[in-house]
A protein has these predicted regions:
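ATP/nucleoside-binding phosphotransfer catalytic cores, i.e., glycine-rich phosphate-binding loops
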Residues: 2-22, 31, 36-56, 240-327
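Glycine-rich phosphate/diphosphate-binding loops that line cofactor/substrate pockets in enzymes
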Residues: 59-72, 245-246
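Glycine-rich N-terminal segment of FAD-binding domains in flavoprotein oxidoreductases
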Residues: 66-97
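Gly/Ser/Thr-rich loops at beta-strand to alpha-helix junctions
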Residues: 76-86, 179-184, 259-260
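Class I SAM-dependent methyltransferase SAM-binding "motif I" and its flanking Rossmann-like core
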Residues: 181-234
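A general structural motif
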Residues: 230-239, 279
Length: 327
């Protein structure tokens, strides 16, 4: 019996980007073939590299080292948990006696509960707490930045977090990674509703309810047992806004997440949509193309998605046995 592909359907109604013509186009775009500075901002570059983690580590270490050598302030916006990165950077800082005294750290986003109460860094449910455990506490005491240089989220500073960053002259660098539907951390169209790109780019820090896909995704993290324990993931988050990303002097995006225990790169399509879809509020990741920076992509994410052909397992077994009999 012959099969055909006449079955059509629309994207799930809750998904922010609905243009099927664009979706069908970008899914076939080759990340590797579009490497380089081929985007709206000539200072934005797309690069496929074998060890994205290493590029992240080297970039952050070098910026901290220069802030020490030149005795200049360095303001960074960090995603967390990035424990492997934190450990590697700290090992180098300790080895070469590099001081972080001039470094100010802000966090891309943090968990909050249904009441809008922000997880304190001492909580096992805090993203920024991982920075303290795997970076600050492991750094030699004489090399540490003052605790007041670590700008934690609180319930009181949700609306003013962007102002705190701006008061220090904006971020010198922001590090990000894409989430589902081309979101940037907890920045997605639902939490940042805007009619125009211009309006979207002016939006600052706030309390949001992440997309359901983000809750499911986070349930696969080590801090939640890599188990799919959806009910154990805090339901809300506080996050910086597009305004803070665009005000940074440089933007480094890293795409190297794979599923726990597997090689399925869930960032493939979000990256394709961000790189090749329209720049608009419904496609948050696309705004990085307007900014100076680099998007580092691991080979697993850069490899096009694939669907294995369907087949009748009994027919396949019969074919194998027939070949064996003819040997």
């Amino acid at each position: 019996m012959a099969f055909n592909n006449t079955f059509k359907f629309a994207p799930a109604e809750w998904l922010p980007f609905q243009d099927t013509e664009v979706l069908d186009k970008v899914v076939n775009m080759d990340i590797r073939a579009h490497q380089g500075k081929n985007f709206e901002n000539p200072d934005f570059e797309l690069k496929v590299v074998f060890d994205v983690h290493n590029y992240f580590v080297v970039d952050l270490f070098q910026r901290i080292r220069l802030s020490d050598v030149k005795n200049e302030k360095l303001v960074v916006i960090l995603p967390s948990p990035e424990n492997a990165v934190f450990l590697s950077v700290v090992e180098a800082l300790n080895k070469y006696k590099v001081s972080t005294r001039n470094v100010h750290v802000f966090f891309l986003y943090e968990y909050a509960n249904e009441k809008g109460e922000v997880a304190p860094w001492q909580s096992p449910y805090s993203r920024s707490g991982h920075f303290i455990r795997y970076f600050y506490n492991r750094l030699d005491a004489e090399l540490r930045m003052p605790m007041e240089n670590i700008h934690f989220w609180t319930k009181e500073n949700i609306e003013t977090y962007s102002d705190e960053i701006e008061a220090l002259g904006g971020a010198d660098v922001v590090y990000t990674a894409l989430s589902w539907s081309s979101g940037i951390g907890a920045i997605d169209p639902e939490g940042f509703p805007a009619k125009t790109t211009e309006e979207f780019l002016k939006m600052g820090s706030r309390l949001v309810t992440p997309m359901a896909e983000m809750i499911v995704h986070d349930s696969l993290r080590g801090m939640f047992g890599c188990s799919g324990d959806i009910a154990n993931v805090p339901p809300r988050a506080v996050t910086v806004g597009p305004k803070d990303l665009m005000a940074s002097k440089e933007w480094i995006d890293v795409e190297y997440l794979i599923s726990c225990g597997g090689a399925i790169a869930q960032q493939k399509f979000p990256l394709q949509l961000a790189m090749f879809g329209p720049i608009c509020p419904e496609n948050p990741g696309s705004i990085m193309r307007l900014h100076k920076g680099t998007c580092y992509v691991c080979p697993e994410v850069a490899t096009p998605g694939n669907t294995l052909p369907d087949y009748d397992i009994l027919e396949r077994i019969a074919e194998i046995r027939k070949k064996e009999e003819n040997l």
